[in-house]
Amino acid sequence: MAKAVVFFAEGTEECEALLVVDLLRRAKVEVLVASASGSREILSSHKVHITADALAEEVDYSDVDLVVLPGGIPGTPNLAANKTVTDTCVSFVKTGKKVAAICAAPSVLAALGLLEGKNATAHAAFQDKLAGAHVLDTEVVVDGNITTSYGLGGAIPFALELVRQLAGETEADRIRSAIAYRH
């Protein structure tokens, strides 16, 4: 069974984060919600209380296939400030494991030098922060083992792409139909 970790921090955009958790779990992917805020209790960008499964520092990433960075302010800078999050992203990219980021969060990957020479996207307000990347203004961009999306409006196609990567095209199509997503 594939395994994913979705990082949450104080101020994470809850819809982007929880949609990924939901659709991956529908696809029978094992998903761990990991807090990057030093507490399992997280307050999202729109004041939704979320309880993480574990702290990011407690997770064994050796059998994890994908890590996901949701956007949100101040969630994105809070993710960027967490050494476990940034070290894990660098390690995953260097070893060919999958990393995904949406909205403002691709800027974290760019700051780490992980988007150098890659195609990527981000929220329009953060596209200028994608140093070294070839920025595309589209919902979802996959370049090698890195997947990016431009924001909440692209969250469903982003999550479905992650389902496709971890559980296959048939499962992504099944979920697309089950949630009545017709785009």
Please state what every model-predicted region is.
Residues K3-T12, R26-S35, D53-H183:
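Active-site-adjacent pocket-lining segments in enzyme domains
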Residues R40-S44, E139-V142:
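Short acidic-hydrophobic surface loop/beta-edge motif
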Residues E41-D53:
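A cross-family phosphate/adenosyl-ligand binding-site feature
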Residues L18, S35-G38:
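Short glycine/proline-centered loop/turn elements that form peptide/ligand docking sites
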Residues T12-A17, E41:
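Short N-terminal binding/cap micro-motifs at the start of the first secondary-structure element
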Residues L23:
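Rossmann-fold NAD(P)-dependent oxidoreductase module
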